[in-house]
């Protein structure tokens, strides 16, 4: 919640009110993908806890396989939001907000990575102090990158900052999670889909200025 509001606060200080409005609009559309993931995790979290407590040693393998379809659904929703960002923003907002299109696309990539941050390994292991420390690290990274990027690029800088934090922090978070309760992810499928998703959205971002 702090980071969600802090981005806007930093834009307000370091950039213009117009940039704040554009970012706020883009963030609202992109946030639908995170809201979808939050609703979806109410389906699988109870099952994961059950497997963790039932089979403390071998549960990680069944959990990894069980989570793959939910990862598909989450990534697909992020993909739809990113790919159709231009159509959605163009149809539903006045021209002054059309600068939010790229922001929606970038934030959709950032929210896609949050699927891995929703897994409850550290809570199951009782490592709440470690979890708090990791969250504080994430906040500090976000603050530092926001200060550097918003000052130079405005609202786009805030979106890139959120994506950069996701790309750096997610692997760190996953290392600690796997250390305390190992989930046997179907890595090949996940990396292939993430590669397709990121290359598609990045390709669209770079191609947009040349497309009618």
Question: Where do the model's predicted regions map?
Answer:
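Interfacial/gating helices of multi-pass transporter permease domains
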Residues: 11-31, 98-101
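Transmembrane alpha-helical segments of multi-pass transport proteins
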Residues: 138-141, 187-212
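Helix-loop interface residues and adjacent transmembrane-helix termini in multi-pass membrane transporters
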Residues: 2-5, 14-17, 124-126, 152
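Short alpha-helical transmembrane segments in multi-pass integral membrane proteins
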Residues: 27, 69-81, 135, 156-177
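Alpha-helical transmembrane segments of multi-pass membrane transport and lipid-handling proteins
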Residues: 37, 60-113, 143-151, 201
């Amino acid at each position: 919640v702090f980071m969600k509001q802090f981005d806007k606060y930093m834009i307000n200080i370091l950039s213009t009110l117009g940039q704040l409005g554009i970012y706020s609009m883009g963030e609202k559309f992109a946030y639908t993908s995170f809201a979808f993931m939050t609703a979806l995790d109410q389906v699988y979290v109870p099952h994961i806890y059950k497997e963790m407590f039932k089979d403390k040693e071998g549960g990680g393998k069944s959990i990894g396989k069980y989570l793959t379809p939910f990862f598909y659904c989450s990534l697909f929703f992020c993909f739809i939001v990113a790919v159709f960002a231009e159509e959605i923003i163009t149809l539903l907002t006045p021209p002054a907000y059309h600068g939010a299109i790229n922001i929606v696309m970038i934030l959709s990539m950032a929210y896609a990575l949050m699927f891995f941050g929703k897994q409850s390994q550290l809570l199951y292991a009782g490592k709440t102090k470690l979890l708090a420390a990791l969250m504080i690290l994430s906040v500090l990274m976000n603050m530092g990158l926001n200060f550097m990027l918003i000052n130079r690029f405005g609202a786009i800088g805030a979106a890139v900052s959120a994506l950069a934090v996701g790309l750096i922090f997610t692997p760190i978070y996953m290392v600690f999670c796997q250390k305390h309760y190992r989930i046997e992810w179907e890595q090949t499928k996940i990396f292939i889909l993430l590669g397709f998703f990121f290359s598609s959205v990045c390709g669209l971002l770079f191609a947009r200025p040349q497309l009618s």
